[in-house]
Amino acid sequence: GKYQFGKSALRTVGIYDYQEFLRNAEWQDKAFEALIARNKWELRKEIQKYSGRIINGVEITESGLVAAAHLGGAGSVKKYLRSNGRNGFKDGFGTSLSSYIRKFSNYDISHIEADANAKVNLE
């Protein structure tokens, strides 16, 4: 697919047919936006508190934090921030939260509302 999602993440946004998801670019885009909305909600306090700060030489931004949550989960991002970057997650390929925070720091995701229960509308 266009983005990397675990099956459990897809289920949280209402997608249960993984094969159809892989074939359907529209579902992939909708799932991506729904997961951004959920991560923005989950990280809303951290976004407000940490945006603009520098941790490990990287400026903290909303889009960077949301991308890092896509990599390692919102809980890992919270631990990273609370530890001032000392408690860092890496995925199975060695990709770190801080690398995602840097790489995705300047994206405008303001058009996506924070939503604790965001789901994909499949109609």
Residues covered by each model-derived region:
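Non-catalytic cell-wall polysaccharide-engagement segments
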Residues: 3-30, 34-123
